[in-house]
């Protein structure tokens, strides 16, 4: 049985159970997504945006699915603690794909922000969710999006109303926990109305050594003059596979900051699509990858300048050790009429060993003549002259390499605007390079 067929058969056999444990607004697009998946299947390497990762191989194992929504017997608010110094957040949890609510976080947030289970909110406000759900994540264009849409039953809903400023960072801990190998299909819907301002920190963690396959779709609507900061940290283990698609729509004078940090994983495939639909919109998209052993990390981005006077900045850096593999493909599209566009795309990569591999493909596609756009990429090893200089001053070879690697990724970490998180990442990255870090020391499962 090929990879696609097992999921086609699964949906046909369990459609009623899937729908019964979800919400009508999510179920309304489920059959159309199934038809799209039947037609598209998994994207092959012949598809330009998937040329560096063999997707169908990732979905071959027979993972379990929690279709009947059996609750994992853990209270994350009692079992989990985040001890990042000076980081004050309003804390929420998603266990696998089930949102866990507690009473205390709401007390830390102003009126005008909703953080809730996507399925529960859709049952109470079906028209609102139907207006936004699966509108940016088009199932007829991407097989992964179609698969997630046909199987996802719950996730996270964030709604920030007009002119509401959320000073406290909203932290969402995605915990993977299961006694058996598990597939998790998670959805996140973020709606920022005009003038809204909020910051979100998503942290991925595995609480055990089971093998996980996670598909995640994030749809974010950023209204006029709104500001969204989205920080995503992956700290799982080598048996974890994560396929994540993020779709963002920005209106006039909006601002979007996206920072993705991969410190531990097995296979990670991230897709980021940002559509600049209103004049004056700005986005900053940054990524830091530290990989070793046989890790594989693939970041694929599209910045779509649809109107004039928009700005985009991209900076992705990789440090690859052992037999790890990295890939970056970034496309900047400047459409007809998108004059006065300013865009900069940079991908810099460091292969610490001869067996590490990096594939890079920055792309500019411009159909306007009054623009200022640049792109570039580099792949190399540590500078021998710099190493020699440091060795001559009594620094050991190991310490010299560590200092150079740390300085290399420091530029990306410094883009993080949350100062406590930025300081913590400086510490974590240094320990990661020293081989002393197997997981985020600030995040602890309490026995």
Regions found by a protein language model. Name each.
Residues 1-217, 225-227:
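Short, low-to-moderate order helix/coil transition modules at the start of elongated helical scaffolds
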Residues 111, 121-395, 409, 413-447:
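Conserved beta-strand/loop scaffold segments within soluble protein domains that form the structured core
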């Amino acid at each position: 049985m090929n990879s696609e067929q097992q999921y086609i058969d699964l949906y046909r056999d369990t459609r009623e159970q899937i729908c019964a444990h979800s919400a009508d607004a999510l179920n309304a697009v489920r059959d159309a997504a199934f038809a799209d998946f039947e037609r598209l299947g998994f994207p092959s390497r012949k598809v330009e945006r998937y040329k560096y990762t063999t997707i169908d191989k990732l979905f071959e194992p027979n993972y379990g699915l929690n279709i009947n929504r059996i609750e994992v017997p853990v209270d994350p608010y009692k079992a989990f603690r985040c001890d990042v110094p000076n980081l004050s957040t309003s804390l929420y949890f998603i266990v696998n794909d089930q949102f866990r609510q507690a009473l205390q976080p709401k007390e830390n947030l102003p009126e005008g922000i909703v953080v809730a289970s996507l399925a529960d909110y859709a049952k109470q406000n079906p028209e609102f969710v139907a207006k936004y759900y699966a509108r940016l994540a088009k199932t007829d264009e991407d097989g992964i999006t179609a698969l997630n849409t046909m199987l996802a039953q719950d996730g996270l809903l964030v709604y920030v109303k007009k002119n509401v400023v959320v000073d406290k960072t909203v932290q969402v801990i995605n915990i993977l926990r299961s006694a058996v190998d598990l597939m998790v299909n998670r959805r996140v819907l973020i709606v920022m109305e005009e003038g809204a301002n909020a910051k979100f920190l998503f942290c991925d963690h595995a609480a055990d050594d089971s093998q996980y396959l996670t598909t995640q779709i994030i749809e974010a609507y950023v209204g006029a003059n709104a500001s969204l900061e989205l920080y995503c940290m992956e700290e799982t283990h080598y048996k974890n596979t994560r396929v994540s698609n993020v779709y963002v729509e920005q209106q006039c004078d909006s601002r979007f900051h996206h920072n993705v940090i991969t410190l531990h994983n097995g296979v990670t495939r991230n897709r980021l699509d940002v559509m600049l639909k209103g004049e004056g919109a700005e986005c900053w998209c940054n990524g830091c990858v530290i990989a070793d052993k046989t890790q594989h990390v693939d970041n694929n981005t599209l910045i779509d300048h649809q109107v004039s006077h928009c700005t985009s900045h991209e900076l992705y850096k990789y440090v690859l050790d052992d037999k790890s593999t990295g890939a970056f493909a970034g496309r900047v599209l400047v459409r007809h009429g998108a004059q006065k566009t300013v865009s900069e795309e940079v991908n810099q990569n460091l292969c610490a060993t001869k067996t590490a591999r990096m594939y890079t493909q920055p792309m500019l596609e411009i159909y306007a003549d009054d623009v200022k756009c640049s792109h570039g990429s580099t792949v190399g090893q540590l500078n021998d002259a710099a190493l020699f200089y440091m060795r001559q001053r009594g620094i050991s070879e190991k310490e010299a390499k560590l200092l150079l690697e740390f300085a290399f990724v420091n530029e990306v970490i410094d883009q993080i605007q949350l100062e406590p998180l930025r300081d913590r990442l400086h510490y974590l990255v240094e320990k990661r390079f020293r081989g002393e870090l197997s997981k985020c020391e600030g995040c602890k499962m309490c026995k």
